[in-house]
Amino acid sequence: MKRLDPFSDRMSRDIRNALSSALVTELCGEQDRYVDTVAGRWLDDVGEEPYRSYIEQSRVRYGRVLDHIRKRQIRGTRNHAVVLWNFGLFFEMHELLETIWLGSSGKERDALKGLIQAAGAYVHLLRGKPVPARKLAHRARKNIRKAKEYLSFIGNLDQLLHCLEQLADPPPKLLHG
């Protein structure tokens, strides 16, 4: 069976990006049940494995995240990013944080960039690519350290920095600040 790899297969990348964007859209409150809508469209168009399984698994994982956020009434993009991290959805966290990073400036921009890079480091690590993961983790630590005050929504930022230095696997769970 073909392996799903968004880094080398166009269809995999398109599906991952569409589903991730749907999750971000739903988290930003722009459209309810959008993950189900987008997943359904892809399932109608894609008949082969591993795409179908990936779409179904993503739909289930995203549903769990959305239920978790709703049941606990977690508000705000930054807090949603913490939840995505804790669910191991590093690519999706990166996508969500980019929605506020693009409009930020100065040290806040550096801080958000550091978190985006930290998520990217774990995307690479989980893909079995330790060299790019280490490089990205190094840049993440640098950006986070110079702007820590903008990341007060993370209660264990020092632990995250330590784990990025060691590139700990599994990554630490983030605490809400």
Predicted regions and their residues:
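Aromatic- and histidine-enriched alpha-helix N-cap/loop-to-helix transition segments
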Residues: G88, L112-I116
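N-terminal alpha-helical interaction modules that lie
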Residues: M1-E92, L96-G103, K146-G177
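Residues that mark the junctions of alpha-helical repeat units in TPR/alpha-solenoid scaffolds
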Residues: Q73-I74, G106, D110-K113
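TPR/TPR-like (Sel1-like) alpha-helical repeat modules
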Residues: L126-K148
